[in-house]
Amino acid sequence: MIWNAAEKISRKEMRELQLSRLRWQVEYAYSHVPFYKKKWDEIGLKPSHIERLSDISKIPFTVKTDLRDHYPTGLFAVPNREIVRFHSSSGTTGKPIVVGYTRNDMDNWTECCARMASAAGVTRDDIAQIAFGYGLFTGGFGLHYGLERVGASVLPISSGNSERQLMFMQDLKSTVLVATPSYVLHLTEIMEEKGIAKEDIFLKVGLFGGEGHTPEMREQIERRLGIDDTQNYGLTELCGPGVSYECLEHTGMHINEDMFIAEIIDPKTGEVLPEGSIGEIVYTTLTKEGIPMLRYRTKDITRIMYEPCACGRTNARMDLVMGRSDDMMVIRGVNVFPSQVESVLMGIDGIGQQYQLIVTTEKYMDRMEVQVELLDGAILESYSNLERLTAEIRHKIKTVLQIDVKVTLLNPKTLERTAGKSKRVIDKRLKAF
């Protein structure tokens, strides 16, 4: 089902709408956000210079460090009294990125997620079980309001407590599941251990995001649960989930082009690439009041497809993300940077400078092991000291990352040294891209 007429207007109409909204957004950002005004003034750029869509390439990029450097609200365009919701994502040095939504921003976010739900076939006859975390993470709330807008009944169970998830799934006859794909496969393992067959549940479709997943994972989810697996894409910096989404044709993720302009650039040079090219996707918001984002570099590698979809939607589609242009990892839906872990480790007495992160998949769930050298191997001879230090590291890392990790303490000079850049991460997971 097509929820909004904006999803099927002609390319000409969409470009005209985008240009009108782009002009408004750049004027708004320039006049309300000192960061943008200063940046533009330094290069002699004025909002009036944006006359055509192609002029967007004149606008300087915005990057994650810009938000971090202006923590918490330095890029906001409105005072806090006009913000009705704050969300945040983890930061690489302990400070998170904070975003704010005005009432209109919340309405547009809800609309984006309603389109996502509708594209997956969700209606007012469905019961949607949201197994995303609620809180500062945008995942749970975005889908919550979007699903309510299409009329679905929402079960905001949040993440974890798998036995409780399955109990409600059966008792309330949930038909839609919202979660990370790795958690879904974890649930199927528990179902099979308990003798719960797919015929014993009522799920028909999944709205999965927060991390990529392989075609093999999708095939397993669909086969073991008997559902249609749809993927979606979003970033906290833009709005959270709802930037783009799959329909039931599975031919790419439809971009909400009336809300965002997407470009593909060369991640090394920053030059805009021709249509059909694979590169880094860059997004510009078109309707944001709280914190407008102009040419935000996502670091995600993909391509954009412009031909109409068989579902009837004409908005452009982004391919599933093929990789990252930086060192960020996504573990159980959480953005993790090696520098976050390093920052924690370097602040603990007795810990050396050499460490390594081992990322694996166990029972379809991402796991991370932190291997770190000690300054003095004698600590390993004392069980109480070893246990205390291990617990301290685990606790401090969980405080920063919000995920549990395994910690292995090593003797000095255990890890391999190289003359070049140290290999901090060993990712043994099946590649999702």
Regions from the language model: what does each represent?
Residues 204, 213-308:
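Conserved AMP-binding/adenylate-forming
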Residues 29, 88-92, 128, 177, ...:
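Conserved S/T- and glycine-rich ATP-binding loop of Class I adenylate-forming
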Residues 127, 194-213:
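Conserved helix-loop-beta element of the AMP-binding
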Residues 127-130, 282, 371:
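Short, well-ordered beta-strand segments
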Residues 177, 287-403, 420:
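AMP-binding/adenylate-forming catalytic core of the ANL superfamily
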Residues 1-88, 93-111, 115-119, 123-124, ...:
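Nucleotide 5′-phosphate-binding alpha/beta core
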Residues 183-202, 219-224:
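Adenylate-forming
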